[in-house]
Curated annotation (Swiss-Prot):
CDD domains: UDG-F1-like (cd10027). Its main location: host cell. The lineage of its organism: Viruses, Duplodnaviria, Heunggongvirae, Peploviricota, Herviviricetes. Excises uracil residues from the DNA which can arise as a result of misincorporation of dUMP residues by DNA polymerase or deamination of cytosines. Therefore may reduce deleterious uracil incorporation into the viral genome, particularly in terminally differentiated cells which lack DNA repair enzymes. GO terms for biological process: base-excision repair, AP site formation via deaminated base removal. This is Uracil-DNA glycosylase. One of its GO terms (cellular component) is host cell nucleus. Keywords: DNA damage, DNA repair, Host nucleus, Hydrolase. Belongs to the uracil-DNA glycosylase (UDG) superfamily. UNG family. One of its GO terms (molecular function) is uracil DNA N-glycosylase activity. Its EC number is 3.2.2.27. It comes from Alcelaphine herpesvirus 1 (strain C500). Transmembrane segments: none annotated.
Length: 252
């Protein structure tokens, strides 16, 4: 794969440069799991350097130190559920984990709907009054945006900055190396990633995006509405059937 990318997609990068994990902000277990060769490290380092330079002239979210925060919540071998988002919140609340915000920020509308759906599956669930999903992450729920940065108040502004190859690598490697994970794909951009997932080894759940806009939209779609999709209950049933500890969706 690397040789094909070198030849067809990217200009040649120097082989002799070696960037340690802290240079590319990625937790070491993920560096090893993704087989981050010097070539891949250089490519990721270049993207991060470009974004860091852009911060001198515009506001970018999340902060540089939080871009890879998703990689520090659980080891790759412990991932059980993958929730794929689009790009980070662009209003200052992004923290490097899809749909999540740090405590102290208002709960975004999409996350409010996610909490509604959890409560639909588990009536005892109580919305925590905050939007921090780190407790899910520590149990093996990977909250991954396909684009890892965004310019303030400009959604989708970093879609062409070089993140797609990296997040595609994460998704495909999880699919290839793990077994019996649940991939939750909400919205057309996330659903497009289903082509990278081995459906013989994993459960793929699809629905419309949890945003209120998608919920109100009456356009024709082959995907079920997010509210009422039952994904959180279905995921735990699947994990239990495959001798994995189900996710406790409770948030304190």
């Amino acid at each position: 794969m690397e040789e094909w990318l070198r030849k067809h997609m990217w200009p040649a990068l120097p082989d002799h440069q070696h960037h340690p994990s802290y240079d590319i902000l990625l937790a070491e277990p993920w560096v090893q799991f993704l087989d981050m060769t010097p070539f891949f490290r250089q490519k990721l380092y270049n993207t991060l350097s470009k974004i860091n330079e852009m911060r001198k002239s515009c506001i970018i979210y999340p902060p540089q130190a939080e871009i890879m925060s998703w990689s520090y919540l659980c080891a790759p071998e412990d991932v059980k559920v993958v929730i794929i988002g689009q790009d980070p919140y662009h209003g200052g609340q992004a923290n490097g984990q899809a749909f999540s915000v740090n405590k102290g920020f208002p709960v975004p509308p999409s996350l409010q709907n996610i909490f509604k759906e959890v409560r639909s599956c588990y009536p005892d669930f109580v919305s925590p009054g905050h939007g921090c999903l780190e407790e899910w992450g520590r149990q093996g729920v990977l909250l991954l945006n396909t684009i890892l940065t965004v310019e303030a108040k400009k959604p989708g502004s970093h879609s062409d900055l070089g993140w797609t190859w990296f997040t595609n690598l994460i998704i495909s490697t999880l699919s290839n190396k793990l077994n019996n994970c649940v991939f939750m794909l909400w919205g057309s951009k996330a659903i497009a990633k289903s082509l990278m997932i081995n459906k013989q080894r994993h459960l793929v759940l699809k629905a419309q995006h949890p945003s209120p806009l998608a919920a109100k939209n009456n356009y024709s779609s082959s995907q079920c509405k997010f509210l009422g999709c039952g994904h959180f209950l279905t995921a735990n049933k699947y994990l239990t059937q495959h001798n994995k500890v189900p996710i406790d969706w409770t948030l304190e």
